Design a protein with these regions (language model features):
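C-terminal peripheral helix-coil segments that are non-catalytic and often amphipathic
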Residues: 1-9, 104, 143-147, 170, ...
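HTH DNA-binding helix-turn interface
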Residues: 37-38, 59-71
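Key DNA-contact positions within bacterial/archaeal DNA-binding proteins
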Residues: 56
């Protein structure tokens, strides 16, 4: 590579870094606006104004308003998956580990996560009919582990996919109640744990019971 090509390549890298930093800054502004105002009051125009950029720039960086919400919730799901990389082997401790991580995440910024998840529901981003959508990604976090069957903790009389769906549903229903303001996070923890453990009990071996 010649000197000129090196300069051009360096310039391209620098521009991409600056673009990513600007995008991250605007993304954080969007998070704050959604947390304070909710979905209905959140607009691309106001986001652009506070960020000091043009509306077309926002569209170029993120797309539509719904795309921003989808990315926010996608990041949340990725965070949940990252938090679950080294879970306990015991199913009960695993369930507690998972639910505690969800609660701890929500506690970091209650207003934002409630607003973002409410927005996602309103925009139907959790519609199970969307191929490879948020619903399917969230379900994968709830999948039972293969070593539970290998250790004889689960009998295998119920399809793992069914257990995954029911565990995810226990978390989802509790989350919807929390987002709607019907329960607090402690009640969410209790509701989600009870639902998950009842699902596990339906296929647990006598020894595990």
């Amino acid at each position: 590579m010649g000197e000129k090509e090196k300069v051009i390549a360096h310039g391209n890298v620098a521009r991409q870094i600056n673009k990513n930093l600007r995008r991250e800054r605007i993304f954080n502004i969007a998070k704050n606006q959604i947390a304070k105002k909710g979905l209905e009051a959140f607009t691309i125009a106001e986001l652009a104004q506070e960020a000091g950029v043009s509306t077309p720039t926002i569209h170029n960086l993120f797309g539509k308003k719904s795309d921003i919400i989808k990315e926010l919730v996608s990041n949340l799901i990725e965070q949940m998956q990252g938090n679950s990389l080294n879970p306990p082997i015991d199913p009960i401790e695993n369930a507690k580990f998972f639910v505690d991580n969800v609660v701890a995440t929500f506690e970091q910024d209650t207003d934002f996560y409630r607003a973002a998840l409410m927005s996602a529901e309103q925009l139907r981003l959790f519609d199970p009919r969307i191929p490879d959508g948020l619903f399917q990604r969230a379900q994968q976090v709830a999948a039972p582990r293969k070593d539970w069957y290998e250790a004889g903790l689960f009998l295998g009389n119920i399809e793992p996919s069914t257990i995954m769906k029911k565990v995810h549903n226990s978390n989802r229903l509790g989350r919807i109640d929390w987002v709607s303001g019907y329960i607090d996070l402690n009640q969410f923890r209790h509701k989600a744990m009870m639902g998950i453990l009842l699902v596990y009990a339906s296929d647990a071996s006598p020894e595990f019971h």
